[in-house]
Amino acid sequence: MIIADNIKQFHSIRNSLIKQQKIGFVPTMGALHNGHISLIKKAKSENDVVIVSIFVNPTQFNNPNDYQTYPNQLQQDIQILASLDVDVLFNPSEKDIYPDGNLLRIEPKLEIANILEGKSRPGHFSGMLTVILKLLQITKPNNLYLGEKDYQQVMLIKQLVKDFFINTKIIVCPTQRQPSGLPLSSRNKNLTSTDIEIANKIYEILRQDNFSNLEELTNKINSTGAKLQYIQKLNNRIFLAFYIGKVRLIDNFLKETGPSC
């Protein structure tokens, strides 16, 4: 596996790739888990070359503490990527991605950008879309692999690719879950054993509910010791975000299936 720690190194590697080769790209913020691994395996099965990026993007964090406590396990991540036979790891610095600071940003005007996560985390989607645009301009992949867990993010990236005429196909992969139903997330690494017990109780409640009375469901979730930030039905999906201690988790799933594995 080739590791590029800056854009100049990456461009040298990218330019050496045979143009006829199909390139798959999996953007991550590190702290890799089986959800990321499923994306990478999908990319490996459909492309000649797979690029994975690790960059914890500061502009998409509206809470400084969340940014500072985001899990960092670079050496372990490198071992995971090497074991998966990833071709290129792109691991840029903040200075690489924002050489002159955060002077230009994508500001989404879509309705989906201003509800749920957009309402709860002002500026999050702007920062996310800005860095994704930069990463796509750098990597120039044929295929981009995203997880369904970040459903709003996926919808906005689809619009980004369309509006900016980016010749990249987006492949959306199913959310990977623990047996309890809890979606895999890098932030799960910050959960204590007690927190995990609370999460398991929440997902037991969610699996048994028919989502006809969200106020009652809110009370049930809060009774576990968690703090529900929002739960909402949108089309045929349920969206929710909640805190367990200081750890914020999000999820979405089809109303008919619930959070099934």
UniProtKB/Swiss-Prot annotation:
**What's the top EC group for this one?**
ligase
- EC number(s) per entry: 6.3.2.1
Catalytic activity as recorded in UniProt: (R)-pantoate + beta-alanine + ATP = (R)-pantothenate + AMP + diphosphate + H(+)
Q: Membrane spanning segments where?
A: none
InterPro entries for the chain = Cyt_trans-like (IPR004821), Pantoate_ligase (IPR003721), Pantoate_ligase_C (IPR042176), Rossmann-like_a/b/a_fold (IPR014729)
- Record's subcellular location: Cytoplasm
GO CC entries: cytosol
Q: Where does (R)-pantoate bind?
A: Q60, Q153
Pathway(s) = Cofactor biosynthesis; (R)-pantothenate biosynthesis; (R)-pantothenate from (R)-pantoate and beta-alanine: step 1/1
Which residues make up the binding site for ATP?
29-36, 147-150, 184-187
Record-level GO BP terms: pantothenate biosynthetic process
| Keywords of the record | ATP-binding, Cytoplasm, Ligase, Nucleotide-binding, Pantothenate biosynthesis
SUPFAM superfamilies linked to this entry: Nucleotidylyl transferase (SSF52374)
Which residues take part in binding beta-alanine? Q60
Active site annotation, chain numbering: H36
Provide a Gene Ontology MF annotation, just one: ATP binding
Something else known? The reaction proceeds by a bi uni uni bi ping pong mechanism.
Query: What's the subunit arrangement here?
Result: Homodimer.
Annotated NCBIfam families: cyt_tran_rel, panC
Entry function: Catalyzes the condensation of pantoate with beta-alanine in an ATP-dependent reaction via a pantoyl-adenylate intermediate.
UniProt record similarity statement = Belongs to the pantothenate synthetase family.
Protein name, entry field? Pantothenate synthetase
Q: Which organism is it from?
A: Francisella tularensis subsp. mediasiatica (strain FSC147)
Gene that produces this protein: panC
